[in-house]
Amino acid sequence: MLMQSALVALGGATLAAAVSSLEVQGSQFVNSKTGDSFQIVGMAYQIGGSAGYDPSHGKDPLSNGDICKRDAALMQTLGVNTIRVYNLDPNLNHDECASIFNAAGMYMIIDVNSPLAGESLNSGAPWESYYAGYLNRTFAIVEAFKSYPNTLGFFSGNEVIDSVKTGATVPPYVRAVTRDLKNYIKNHADRAIPVGYSAADVRDVLEDSWNYFQCAIDGDETDMSRADMFALNSYSWCGESTFEESGYNQLVALFQGTSVPVFYSEFGCNTPSPRVFTEIESIYGSQMTGVFSGGVVYEYAQEKNDYGLAECNDDGTVNLLADYATLQNQYKKVDFSSVQSVKASTAKVTIPECKASLIKEDGFNNNFTLPAVPPGAQDIIDNGVSPKPVGKIIDISDYTVTHVVKDASGNTLSGLAVKPLADDVSNTPGAAGSGTSSGSGSGSDESGSAAPTLAPQGPLSTAAMIIPAMVGLFFTAGFSLI
């Protein structure tokens, strides 16, 4: 079965529309205008892998508007409503890419760190890398993205705690970075933007990490060091698994009663290959949506670790892989108009007070005395970074994709373009470019054409688990100011 070779969507000029910003209400993400809860249908987006972040050559995943337009169109057709971007340069202009994803109805979750020296916490010696120069760069990331309405939130760390050994020293520093980021946002942004942590799904430290970051020191519910959201990179569902065999039932039981939104910041085991993505119906089904707020598929662009949905070539052309079609077909099995139309609960959640008894694993840090703000950093928190990056939504004159894109059978797609959605509408799986008002049901496809059906290609092998190489690499810090 071959994919249809035409995608029809509006490609002309349009005035900038904006998705509604999301807020955290208890354990849910909530649309600030409709009051509906929001489920993340996400995609990890790091074009070029680690090489895609190259400050010396003015390059990062959100700096090329034509590439963003190409990828936004393909992800919009897939049904993605959120992208996660790992490594960004605050000195580059991201207006065009942010505006394109905004028009396509997609939010952005931004990691404030990068693999370069001085741009992340060193998990081996976090006290050496927590200083004003490091914080200055994280604040600059906030400045660069705070004004985009589709900025969903920031991750203060990614898999910095991956063992009991790192759990002994790292947690207070991640919590301190969270505190500093939230105070900076409070002083310099016009809305509260969630800050959270993306954890490795290492069961020895997962529960303790969650409890360490979600609790309130001295019972103060306004504690600025408390995470606004908690996410995990999990690859425990492989192939034709089940809710029980994958251990998803254990995760639901673990996070039952969470006081902050919990979601998968990465998922998508890559064996068998091609992938089958049978976890989609569970993640967005009744067994999980009361506890989890969706998840982020790892990942859009094919890299050496073989998790991609699309081969993105150096000349700008794209070859879609079988996994793209499979994921699209799995999304079609979910009634997202119902999933996204649930009114957020108004029940007050219980926020645990930080106590040593919350920590179960012997050797994991159970001290909630945090490092003081490092010398020179408080002045930046109070007065802002300088020079100050400024981001804004801009009008896009043409949403037409100019790069050649081929499906998994080698057919060239024609008429590919981003379809700008109406104001306050986010994307949803379904017809190409159709959207939902973050919980108010499916919108109509103004072009009148249905999204293509992409046929999976090739046989499936026996399921097995494989964990990808960690996305966040942590190096000994050096001093770097923007």
Label each region the model flagged:
Residues 2-3, 8-24, 28, 450, ...:
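N-terminal signal peptide
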Residues 20-104:
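Active-site-adjacent substrate/metal-binding segments within catalytic domains
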Residues 55-75, 134-142, 205-223, 276-283:
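Short, acidic/polar
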Residues 65-119, 171-196:
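Aromatic-lined substrate-binding rim segments of carbohydrate-active enzymes
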Residues 138-169, 196:
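Active-site groove signature of glycoside hydrolases
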Residues 166-285:
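Noncatalytic carbohydrate-binding groove/subsite architecture in carbohydrate-active enzymes
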Residues 272-353, 357-367, 371-376, 380, ...:
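Substrate-binding cleft of secreted/luminal carbohydrate-active enzymes
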Residues 449-482:
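Cleavable C-terminal sorting propeptides in eukaryotic secreted/cell-surface proteins
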